[in-house]
Amino acid sequence: MSLLRIRKPKTRKGKKVLLAREPQLIESARTMLFLDGRKCGGNVKLCMKDLQALKKPLVKVLNRKNDITPFDDPSSLEFLTMKNDAALFTFGSTSKKRPDNIILGRIFENEVLDMFELGIKRYQAISEFKNEKIGACVKPCLVFNGPKWAQTEELRRLRNLFIDTFQREKVDSIRLQGIEHVLSFTVTDDMNILMRSYRILLKKSGQRTPRIELEEIGPSADFSIRRTKIASEDLYKQARKQPKQLKVGKKKNISTDALGNTKGRVHLGKQQTGSIQTRRVKALRKTPEEKKENRQRKKVALKAAAAEALASQGNNPFSS
């Protein structure tokens, strides 16, 4: 049950705000909501601050402390995400039972879709790395190391959540100098998640392709997976469903060969080649002698037709 009473808009601006919150055919990049629990400090504050820096400008921060327990009762969290029009959220808290705790999750139709509780075992903030940083609003390259990301459904969903979190606007093409940032995620044997952040350096190699070096710029974190809550297969399939308008229809009689060439087959009806108007080339025109012969043939044909008509009238007994 929603805690926010829906009221009909009375102004044009209010209508535009509600229309912007409705599902769009092409969704924009997702905004993340950051909020604190009853007690929050230390590594949790540093981690959330660095995540805000990586996610900017698609962030909304609530500075007040919230008495929320997302895994027990997510209704207050769903209300805040709906009110702030955020599809992603990060909730930070710390307690004696679960120290240095952050919860990452996403929303679908104003309800929690997936939610993962991660414990911070080790953390190095961006400020601890004394080197040059990347610019703002840079789209990072996401690297998921190892086959363990596909072993369980929880890890597959967590990988998908990381992609949703750091994904920005979709682009058709990129330039080589625009690739500046790499975020690496690794699952260890004891099911810990190692997050590393690198800056890409393009060095001269004497060839057309530059030599690439990685410089760690932070944040650097080791997470342990605590509690998880994932959606059912039917709900997850519904959340991933694309509108019919965006689906590419199957094109008939079109195929692609091994070299990537597109070939098409066209079906035509029976053609009347005798009535096709062709270009009259001077070399194909008739000579005066041929024209004279044609006129004589026409005259002979007309005389023969007239004689045949007279003969048929003479043989008719009823003719006067």
Curated annotation (Swiss-Prot):
The keyword Cell cycle belongs to this UniProt entry's keyword annotation: yes
GO biological process, one term: cell division
An example Gene Ontology CC term for this record: nucleolus
SMART domains assigned: Brix (SM00879)
GO molecular function, one term: rRNA binding
Coiled coil: none
Residues covered by the Brix domain: 30-234
Record flagged with keyword Nucleus: yes
Keywords: Cell cycle, Cell division, Mitosis, Nucleus
Segments of skewed composition (Low complexity): 302-311
Pfam families found in the cross-reference section: Brix
Compartments reported by the entry: Nucleus, Nucleolus
Segments for region (Disordered): 268-320
Principal location class: nucleus
Function statement: Required for normal assembly of the mitotic spindle. May be involved in both centrosome-dependent and centrosome-independent spindle assembly programs.
Family designation: Belongs to the RPF2 family.
Protein name: Ribosome production factor 2 homolog
Organism whose genome encodes this protein: Drosophila melanogaster
